[in-house]
Amino acid sequence: MRQLPAGPSSLACSGCKAGRLVTVPFSSRDAEDQGSREGIGWQPPGRSWAHTTEQEGKHQVAKATVHPPGPDALLLNQVDPVQCCPTRL
């Protein structure tokens, strides 16, 4: 096999692939799926994404225990509207 000379075209080709992973803009569907969460937009070149239920097209539902409000909790109709939303004059 012949070795190709290391010219600008081969450098551009090798740099192009790594650059694409970083600079590809998200499609509108990706932006909707990811929302405003941080730390998801960039993946180092050469590493594959881990398979999670969210990436498989299913939304991950966090299971949370819902506690009933305590006796000192204010219900919506008990909140003073002046204290909550002051009017601007």
From Swiss-Prot:
MF GO annotations: calcium-dependent protein binding; DNA binding
Gene Ontology CC annotation, any one: nucleoplasm
Function as written in the Swiss-Prot or TrEMBL entry: Unknown for isoform 4. Csen is involved in calcium-dependent transcriptional repression, regulation of potassium channels, and perhaps in processing of PSEN2 and apoptosis.
Tissue expression pattern: Isoform 1 or isoform 4 (T+ forms) are expressed at equal levels with isoform 2 or isoform 3 (T- forms) in brain.
Domain of life: Eukaryota
Any single GO BP term: potassium ion transport
Region (Disordered): 27-57
Protein name: Calsenilin isoform 4
